[in-house]
Amino acid sequence: MTDYAVLFRELAIPRLAGTPNHQKVREILKRELMARGFSVEQQAFRGRPARALLGTPRVVAGTNLIAQRLSGGPTVGPSVWLVAHYDSKGQPISMAVRLVGFFALLLGFVTLFVALLPALAILAVAFVIVSQNRVTDNSPGAVDNATALVAIFMTIDQLSSGARVGVVFSDAEEFGLVGARSLAAERSSLFAAAALINLDSLDDTGRSTAFVHRRGRIGGAVADALKARQWRWLPVIVDGIALSAVCRECVTILKGDWQTMRIIHRPADSVARVRLDGAASVAAGLARVLRAE
C-alpha cells in the first residue's frame, strides 16, 4: 500500500523542466505507474516557451508520460484521462502578485481613455510587476503541482484494474503549456473520444473550482461531486486550455484560496504547509464518479 505522504515528499522538490530533480521526479512517476500495471510511453518534445516569461531558454525540451493499463484483450483506449503537470517553477513574485499586475495592466489601458496621469501611474506599477515575471528553480511546487500528482494515484488506487482510465503526466506546463501543446499536436487521436480531467494545485484550504473548457457529462458530474464552483474563464494558464480542442470534454479542477495564490511559485510552496487533505477529497470525489461509469 502506498504511503502518500512519503510519495508527496519525494515529488515536492524544485523540479524546473530540464534539471536533475525534474528527471528524478519523472522516474518516480514511471515507477509508481508501472507498479500499478500501467504501460508508460514517453513522448519527447521541444517547443518555445511563452513570450511573457523572462529568463527562459529559446527552446524547451521535455517528456510527457502517457500511461495506459495493460490488457490481454482487444485494445480499447481510455474513456477518461486524468492529467497533471509534473514540472515546477519558482518566480520572484507569487501568482497573487502576478494577477494584481495583470488586472493593473487592464485597468491602466482602460483608464487611458478617461484620465491620462492616473492611467500612466497604474501602468507603471503594472510594468514593474510584469518585469519580475522571471523563471527560477527555487520553489518545491508542493501545491503546484505535487498535490495533483498524488491525487491521481489516490484516485486510480480506488478504481478497479479494469477501469478505462488513462493517465497523462504532462511536462513544461510552467513554460507556457509546452507539453500540452505537443500532446494536442502529436497525440490528439488518444483523446478524441474521451473525457479529460486536468488537476492543478489542490490545496487543503479553499473550495474546489471547475474551470470548464469543454462541457460534458463526466466533467459536470465531477464538479457536482466536489461541490465545485464552475467557471468558463479564469485568469490562469492550465493544460486544459491547450488540450480541450482535441477531446470530447475537458475540465480543470483546482482547489485553494487567496493564501494559496500567495505561495504558488514561491519557496513557501513546500510540504510543510500541506496535509494532502485537499488532494484526498478531490480524489475521493473523482473516484466516486469514475466507479459509476
Language model segments and positions:
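A structural signal for isolated positions on well-ordered beta-strands in alpha/beta enzyme cores
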Residues: E41, W81, G166-V168
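Acidic/histidine-rich catalytic neighborhood of metal-dependent amide-processing enzymes
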Residues: G90-I93, L107-G108, P118-A221, R232-A242
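Soluble non-cytosolic domains of exported or imported proteins
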Residues: T2, L16-E27, A142-A146, V150, ...
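Active-site-adjacent substrate-binding region
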Residues: A44, A194-A195, L202-E293
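Extracytoplasmic/secreted proteins, especially bacterial periplasmic and envelope-associated proteins
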Residues: D3-V6, K24, I28, G179-S182, ...
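A non-catalytic alpha/beta surface segment that caps or lines the substrate-entry region
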Residues: L7, I13-G73, I93-F109, A121
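Short beta-strand element of the alpha/beta-hydrolase
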Residues: P78-H85
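N-terminal capping segment at the start of a domain
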Residues: M1-V25, K30-E32, R36, A50-T56, ...
